Swiss-Prot record:
Region of interest called Disordered, as start-end residue ranges on this chain: 1-85, 335-371, 660-694, 798-843, 1016-1035, 1334-1364, 1454-1497
Transmembrane regions listed in the UniProt entry: none
GO molecular function, a single term: transcription coactivator activity
Protein name as catalogued: Putative uncharacterized protein DDB_G0281251
Compositional bias segments (type: Polar residues): 24-42, 834-843, 1016-1027
Cysteine disulfide partners in this protein: none
């Protein structure tokens, strides 16, 4: 602006300016009163003409400047209005704030702002010129100051017309509006002259305020508009820097400090002093909160309620009316209802997005909100637009410094952050972090903490309403923005060669203030200095140990005013506040072990549990279950949903599409084709068989034919058995949870908890019993939001991670020893068991787009005592794959990661997971960021100083990358900010324990009784008092169970008061399973975020919880006793009754069954997804499925069908991990045992199986057949004695004969190698048993031959009797050999079989029966000998021949047992004996020698086993005349 323009604005332009402002005030406050008439301009710009309005209750009429109102019930009349008074247009009541914003939506708002600011600067310049000339009198000086003050007041009112009252511009979401962006664009730029004037005025205001606060008789001083002016001007980054340099911010925060102490002194709401000061102090503190957040460059992105913000045009022509464009929403997602949240619609799943949120997964603690666009873009745009104006002001500022005697070298560009650059651009991140530290030194955190403590003390029983609630939300939002905004990476410590670093000194002359015997420094924080290392460790500590974290914790949890009878708006406001608090807690403790320790010691996780419970209790879906009711319209309730789903499993999609409920589509399994390597999602009921033609009708439900209806369809389906290729997609599709009306509040809560699940500190290291005296609430300058922490491998590192409990861990480390002597002298046995609960934790490396991570897995040799390791390299980030390593054997696993970034910075990381048997030596883990040096200190800080909480606790040591290859510490590339850095994260095990072991624990439910004052370690049973040391005092902050009981008794007076809280909690779970469904979605999102969470979830007994009565059930009645069921049926929750007043009981029942059926299918889908995720080992999942199958084998065949189909899907989708799990679990013992149980049950019932039992049996047969034909599993099946027993047992039954013969012949074709350990062991043991049995068999034969030798005359035996005798002897020898083999294999592994004892007893009884049969045969032989003596004379030669044949057969059998023969084919072993021939006229059973699978094992013992098979098959063939034709592809 030149001088002519300034003179016009100061002289002739003032009258027009004030007229415009007065007209604007009239528009902002339209009113009508008696004897007066106000003119309201018509809204012609909107196209709305002024018309007369009439109301149903009252009307306004004006005659001769008199206004009269006539009311007559529902009708009204009005007299004619005068011509000069226009009426308010219809609809104007909906735009109460619209007139004030209309000015800013056009170019007029910017013109008025520029005119007022120019007038203020001209008046200030004239005043200073007059003072220098000493020609102005005192009265003229006062009038000049009054004129300047009035101009500033009008300027503030132009930006905020109600600056002295609580208004919408003080809310947390105002910064996200378009008007805020427009005002930010029009913010003027300060200079030194203006800043000094404002500083003097603020100093006078603070002095007057301090007097008024100490004396209630004094009036409230004038000067609040100066605080508001600083709030408006500090929005510009240029103004913020200058305000800091001139110490203009100290006075506003001193006023806020005085205001917070005044709030702390209030004890009674009816006190006149409280009534006087409370509205004023709210506005003062709110402006100071906004001033503090203005120094955060990413304010909109960090705010939780960030939906959108205004955008401006880059047109610099201020005279153009179209230079300010009303922008649309720039939010990355859909608009969040109720002040933020997530959409209830199902998002589309793409490879680059999260399957639950629909957004790209990011770091859990990388942002304070869900907005994707930062305020830095607007600030950068403002900087570029004001660049020319800044350069024009530099010359004027330089002249001003020369006038007041300052050094000529001190220029405006020298003082911005102490950096002088060659260009005029300023890094917003650098400026923001530098200024935030200055805000911390002004005591902002202590002001916010005192304000929160005021709400905790003053609003114990009453909930804050309206402006009080908005003010409370603003305080916690400010705290979160400051802590999270302080985590940005900076480049202040390192500059390029083109920059020069200077020091901008600013002395703070404000003295210490002593109020209420408490010394308050100018800085509410103290900056810790690491004197040992000679650097700053950047730890900011609050003034009192532990009290601040306790104040924040007391803001959440169950409150006395939280009741189900409250309005939804009141509960929503309380929820939003507590959700903000949880996010602040996450930012505070996610990267600081001290804060985490005190959060746990003050029962922080129990408070989070209370939040989960009261949110589940109080909230319902916003649509009152409308979407759920629409989704369950086709849900059939005529029969149990589980039985219907089981009957439809295996049906073709074309036949079952019209009869299949919606929920049965929830479980998906990948179906793999032999010609395609990619996996596609199919239904669990998918089938490849279309042979079934009949349909079944059950309970008015048409059941289509399925592949498990008969064994013939099962055999046909085995032809199409295929398995997934190893090169297929590793990440399977997550299960689709039941479509329902979600509770938005619960979804938002678990979204925050998910971000809280990954931290930079190991929560397993927290020592709750530590007597640490440091005890301060510490928060890093570079928090978990943006910092990148990875381990340095300069030395051999050893990390002893404790178990996920609260037990203390002592690390005996030798800091002087830099060598890692990890000597393990113990032999580790490979037991193939479940992952042990060793003292280990999993460190997580986050993935980046441009990173290649190689993990070397060095596992100690189990059979060696040396230190040699077997290394294998796995590339886990190429091809977007995660390699998961499970410590199934409990041995040492060393993870060595080498990470290479785009900036050629190589950093290595080592974490050793050791057992208690290992020696823990020196642990030197140096946390290194490859981008910048964020803290000083030595690079040799030991890991023990990080894990041990003591007085010398030091935060993670972050040093500049000295191991970077190809870059120096001063190289720009070495400190370049990476968009997706790798963070070394730890899983928050205490949070998982809170959700799993405490929230759904039966012990927890039983402890919730009437004795609330007793001290207990359980979370809810403890009294939720403000003072954790005094748990016996009764106060208003009672436990969740007591509040719920009292609330329930008011609604149901007839309810027994002795009702336990266990029933109450069961009532919450059983009213609707929304909490369980949210936890399932939380677990899926947790594992997708990082697969390393799955072993930790297994360690916390995830599957025991999922399949327990606390979580997984098909109906609510399955988990409760009779008393609980009666109570639940007679009472309903408030949310259910309020939303279901017009819904019938049948619809309520259908909705409930629909949701719980979705919970059951969701649990099955969860275990299938985790079992196939990343093709990893799924031993525990397979084990729990088999356990549930055994439990449900007889009582619930529908569960058996679902679980067996689940096993089929998992085996086909993930054969790489499943096959090994099945081998460890000895699946060929498990399934035959189930078949034996079903076989005995069918015999004992003396009736045919029902439809479900038969289908359960058939699906088990189908799974067994699929396992037998598997290439690897078939060789384990051929040597499993229990499987062979069951297959020959099924031969005796006509219905299962075909299936059994098919499997037997397939096993007979296998080419088993005699070198395998299982076959060798079986052969050696069976030979010994056969020798013993042959010796026992020879004794009765010798006794029977003695009478024959004594007889002098030979007897003649008929030819038919001789043939029958030969067959009997051959069958006896073969049965003995088969029985000996069975006993041998049974004796080989007695501990692995679940039914080994019963089977051994059955085998011994079989031997006794055979001995009795032998005795009977001997008696028959003696009778035959008497008959033969009569015929000896007739046939002497025939008798001699038969005796010779018998002796020869016995000698051959003895030779076969003692000496093994060479490998032979089946035909050579069988010979030409007619009794053992497989080919006949009535049967086509044949085995070709030319077949590729016609060879037998290389042992006569196995040949004897197959001879037994052949003999039994021949006997069955003679009994039946059926024809079998088998074709093996």
């Amino acid at each position: 602006m030149d001088k002519n323009n300034n003179n016009n604005n100061s002289n002739g332009g003032h009258e027009n300016l004030f007229k415009d402002l007065q007209n604007q005030k009239r528009v902002q406050n339209p009113s009508f009163s008696s004897g007066q008439s106000r003119t309201v301009p018509s809204i012609s710009a909107r196209g709305v003409a002024p018309i007369s309005s009439s109301s149903s209750s009252s009307s306004i009429s004006t005659t001769n400047n008199t206004t009269t109102t006539t009311t007559s019930g529902t009708g009204s009349t009005s007299s004619p209005v005068s011509k000069g008074v226009p009426l308010i247009p219809i609809g104007a009541s909906r735009f109460k704030q619209q007139p004030s914003t209309d000015v800013w939506r056009s170019a007029r708002g910017q013109q008025l702002s520029e005119s007022l600011w120019s007038s203020f600067k001209q008046a200030l310049q004239n005043s200073q010129n007059s003072q220098q000339s000493l020609s102005q009198s005192l009265s003229q000086s006062h009038s000049t100051n009054s004129e300047i003050n009035n101009i500033l007041l009008e300027f503030v009112k132009h930006y905020n017309s109600e600056y002295d009252k609580w208004n919408v511009e003080m809310g947390v979401d105002y910064a996200n509006t378009k008007v805020y962006g427009i005002k930010l664009y029009c913010t003027p730029v300060l200079d030194i002259q203006t800043t000094l004037y404002l500083t003097r005025q603020l100093c006078s205001y603070v002095l007057n305020l301090s007097k008024a606060l100490t004396d209630d008789n004094l009036d409230i001083p004038d000067g609040l508009h100066f605080i508001c002016l600083i709030n408006i001007l500090s929005r510009s980054p240029l103004n913020s820097t200058l305000l800091h340099q001139e110490n203009a911010l100290a006075h506003p925060f001193q006023a806020a400090r005085l205001a917070s102490y005044k709030l702390s002194s209030f004890r009674d709401k009816n006190n006149p002093s409280f009534t006087k000061w409370w509205p004023y102090l709210k506005v003062l503190l709110a402006n100071c909160c906004q001033i503090a957040t203005n120094f955060v460059h990413d304010k909109q992105n960090l705010s939780f309620n960030s939906l959108r913000y205004g955008n401006v045009n880059n047109n610099n022509n201020s005279n153009n009316n179209n230079n300010i464009v009303n922008s649309t929403s720039l939010s990355s997602g859909s608009l969040l209802s109720n002040g933020g949240g997530i959409s209830t619609s199902e998002p589309e799943i793409s490879p680059s997005t999260s399957p639950l949120t629909g957004t790209t997964p990011t770091s859990p603690s990388s942002s304070w909100s869900s907005s994707s666009i930062t305020n830095h873009q607007i600030q950068h745009q403002i900087l570029m637009q004001q660049q020319q104006q800044q350069q024009a002001q530099q010359q004027h500022t330089q002249q001003y410094f020369n006038t007041i005697g300052q050094s000529s070298s001190y220029s405006y560009t020298n003082v911005i952050n102490g950096v002088s650059t060659n260009n005029s651009t300023i890094t917003a991140t650098t400026t923001s972090n530098f200024l935030i530290q200055h805000i911390f030194k002004l005591g902002t955190i202590s002001i916010l903490m005192d304000s929160l403590q005021f709400f905790n003390d003053f609003f114990k029983t009453l909930q804050p309403k309206d402006s009080e609630d908005s003010f409370r939300l603003l305080i916690i939002d400010t705290l979160g923005i400051l802590i999270s905004g302080n985590g940005g990476l900076t480049t202040t410590t390192t500059t390029t060669t083109t920059t020069t670093t200077t020091t901008a000194t600013s002395t703070n002359t404000t003295p210490n203030t002593i109020i209420n015997n408490t010394t308050i420094n100018n800085s509410g924080l103290t900056n810790s200095i690491n004197n040992n290392n000679g650097g700053n460790n950047n730890l900011n500590k609050l003034k009192e140990p532990g009290n601040e974290i306790k104040t924040i914790i007391n803001c959440i949890g169950m409150k006395a005013y939280i009741k189900t009878s409250k309005k939804v708006t009141s509960l929503q406001n309380e929820f939003q506040f507590q959700l903000h608090v949880i996010r602040v807690i996450k930012e505070l403790i996610s990267n600081n072990l001290n804060n985490a320790k005190y959060f746990n010691s003050h029962r922080g996780f129990e408070k989070i549990q209370e939040v989960i419970l009261w949110v589940t209790q109080c909230f319902k879906p916003t649509d009152s279950h409308t979407f759920t009711d629409e989704s369950c319209l086709d849900f059939d309730t005529s029969m149990p949903a589980q039985e219907l789903s089981a009957l439809l499993i295996g049906a073709t999609s074309s036949n079952s599409s019209n009869n299949l409920p919606n929920l049965t589509n929830s479980i998906s399994s990948p179906s793999h084709s032999s010609s395609s390597s990619s996996s596609t999602t199919t239904n669990i009921n998918n089938s490849n068989n279309n042979t079934a033609t009949a349909t079944t009708t059950t309970s008015n439900v048409i059941i289509p034919p399925t592949m498990y209806d008969s064994l013939n369809s099962v055999l046909n389906s085995l032809k199409y058995t295929t398995y997934s290729e190893k090169s297929s997609s590793l990440i399977k599709s997550p299960p689709i949870i039941v479509k329902r009306s979600k509770v938005v509040q619960l979804s938002q809560l678990f979204q925050v908890l998910h971000s809280f699940s990954f931290t930079l500190v190991p929560f397993s290291k927290i020592q709750t019993n530590s007597s640490s005296s440091s005890g301060n609430l510490n928060y890093n300058i570079y928090s978990s939001s943006s910092a990148s922490f990875i381990n340095n491998n300069n030395n051999n590192n050893n990390c002893n991670i404790s178990s996920p409990t609260n037990q203390s861990v002592n690390n005996n480390n030798n800091n002087n020893n830099n060598n890692n002597n990890n000597n393990n002298n113990n032999n580790n046995n490979n037991n193939n068991n479940v992952l042990p609960r060793s003292n280990s934790s999993y460190s997580i490396f986050r993935r980046g787009d441009s990173l290649n991570t190689i993990i070397d897995i060095n596992q100690d040799n189990n059979n060696s005592n040396s230190n040699s390791n077997n290394s294998s390299t796995l590339d886990i980030l190429n091809n977007s794959q995660d390699t998961i390593v499970d410590n199934n054997n409990g041995s040492n696993i060393d993870f060595e990661a080498t990470i290479t970034t785009n900036t050629t910075t190589v950093v290595t990381a080592t974490v050793n997971l050791t057992n208690n048997n290992n020696n823990n030596n020196n642990n030197n883990n140096n946390m290194i960021d490859g981008n910048t040096e964020v803290t000083g200190g030595s690079a040799h800080n030991s890991w023990s100083s990080y894990t041990n909480i003591n007085e010398q606790f030091q935060q993670l040591s972050l040093t500049s990358s000295t191991t970077a290859t190809g870059s120096s510490p001063t190289s720009p590339t070495a400190f370049q900010y990476q968009s997706k850095p790798i963070d070394k994260m730890f899983v928050n095990t205490l949070l998982i324990e809170t959700i799993f072991e405490k929230l759904f624990s039966q012990l927890n439910l039983s402890a919730l009784n009437e004795n609330h004052s007793t001290t207990s370690s359980l979370p809810i049973s403890q009294n939720l008092s403000d003072d954790s040391s005094n748990t016996n005092t009764n106060n208003n902050n009672t436990s969740f169970g007591k509040i719920y009981i009292s609330d329930n008794l008011q609604q149901n007076p007839n309810t027994d008061k002795s009702l336990s809280c266990g029933k109450i909690f069961n009532k919450i779970k059983n009213s609707t399973p929304e909490l369980q469904l949210q936890i399932i979605e939380y677990l899926i999102k947790l594992v997708i975020e990082n697969p390393y969470c799955l072993p930790i979830l297994r360690r916390f007994n995830l599957w025991e919880l999922i399949f327990s009565d606390n979580f997984y059930y098909s109906s609510p009645q399955a988990t409760l006793n009779d008393d609980d069921i009666e109570y639940l049926l007679n009472s309903t929750t408030t949310t259910t009754t309020s939303s279901s007043t017009n819904i019938s009981e049948e619809q309520l029942k259908k909705r409930k069954l629909y949701l719980f059926n979705g919970l059951r299918l969701g649990c099955l889908g969860l275990i299938q997804f985790f079992s196939t995720f990343n093709n990893r080992d799924n031993f525990e999942e397979i084990c729990i499925i088999l356990t549930e199958m055994r439990k449900s084998l007889l009582k619930s065949p529908a569960s058996v069908i679902e679980l067996c189909q689940l096993l089929i899907n998992i085996t086909k989708s993930n054969p790489q991990g499943t096959i090994q799990s099945l081998i460890k679990l000895r699946i060929f013992q498990q399934i035959p045992q189930m078949i034996q149980v079903l076989f005995k049950y069918e015999q004992a019932s003396n009736s045919q199986f029902g439809l479900l039992h038969k289908k359960a049996r058939n699906i088990i047969f189908s799974y067994l057949g699929q396992l037998i034909v598997h290439e690897e599993l078939s060789y384990h099946a051929v040597v499993e004695k229990e499987l062979i027993d069951v297959l020959f047992l099924l031969l005796r039954k006509v219905e299962t004969k075909t299936f059994s013969i098919t499997q037997i012949f397939f096993l007979m074709k296998l080419n088993v190698s005699s070198s395998s350990p299982s076959v060798t062991t079986l052969l050696s043991s069976s030979s010994q048993v056969l020798n013993s049995y042959q010796q026992q068999q020879q004794q009765p034969q010798q006794q029977s031959s003695q009478p024959q030798q004594q007889s002098s005359q030979p007897q003649q035996i008929p030819q038919s009797q001789l043939q029958q005798q030969n067959q009997t002897q051959s069958l006896q020898s073969s049965s003995l050999s088969s029985t000996s083999l069975l006993l041998t294999s049974q004796h080989q592994q007695p501990s692995t079989s679940l039914l080994s004892t019963s089977q051994f007893s059955s085998s011994s009884s079989l031997l006794q029966q055979q001995q009795q049969q032998q005795q009977q045969q001997q008696q028959q032989q003696q009778q035959q000998q008497q008959q033969q003596q009569q015929q000896q004379q007739q046939q002497p030669q025939l008798l001699q021949q038969t005796q010779q044949q018998q002796q020869q057969q016995q000698q051959q059998q003895q030779q076969q047992v003692q000496t093994p023969s060479s490998p032979q084919t089946l035909a050579s072993l069988l010979g030409n004996s007619s009794s053992n021939t497989l080919t006949s006229s009535s049967s086509t059973l044949s085995l070709n020698e030319s077949s590729t699978l016609s060879r037998l094992p290389t042992s006569n013992n196995l040949s004897e086993l197959y001879r037994t098979y052949i003999s039994e098959l021949s006997m069955i063939k003679e009994e039946t005349s059926c024809t079998y034709d088998f074709k093996f592809d």
